[in-house]
UniProtKB/Swiss-Prot annotation:
Domain of life: Bacteria
Listed name of the protein: Uncharacterized protein MG354
Source species taxonomy: Bacteria, Bacillati, Mycoplasmatota, Mycoplasmoidales, Mycoplasmoidaceae
Pfam family, any one: DUF1951
Length: 137
């Protein structure tokens, strides 16, 4: 599957699950703390579709490329949770790819350990910054 098609599918499913800015942030913060979605009030069917896409080893190379590009984008908008949180409100693509990063490393779908560690570190740093910002406000 072509990179843009994967990205479009992921964005579509994520927007079905988390249609508002607050739902996105809640989802990101809750996935950071748990491997279940019981504390997230979003439709689970689109999330299951995202998981199925990320589980497909043939698509993981493209997904990883997209994820790395989005990590670079997130890094460029600033290190504070406030900037990242506001960035997600106007950019659904980084928000969904950010959550896909979570699925890739947390559920062990990604086999390349170097990429897994880079993605894990980036995810945790960004999620921690956003959670800290939300807890302060």
């Amino acid at each position: 599957m072509e990179q843009n098609n994967i990205k479009e599918q992921l964005i579509s499913f994520f927007n079905q699950a988390c249609s508002t800015h607050q739902e996105r942030l809640d989802f990101i913060c809750s996935t950071r703390e748990s491997d279940t979605f019981s504390s997230v009030d979003v439709p689970l069917e689109p999330i299951k579709n995202i998981i199925e896409i990320t589980k497909d080893e043939n698509q993981q190379i493209e997904i990883t490329k997209i994820a790395v590009n989005n990590i670079k984008t997130l890094s460029s908008v600033g290190a504070t949770g406030q900037y990242m949180a506001s960035f997600f409100s106007t950019n659904s693509e980084p928000a969904i790819i950010f959550c896909v990063i979570y699925f890739l490393y947390h559920f062990g779908f990604l086999k390349d350990n170097n990429k897994k560690q880079i993605i894990k570190k980036a995810y945790e740093t960004i999620a921690d910054n956003i959670a800290d910002y939300l807890n302060e406000n």
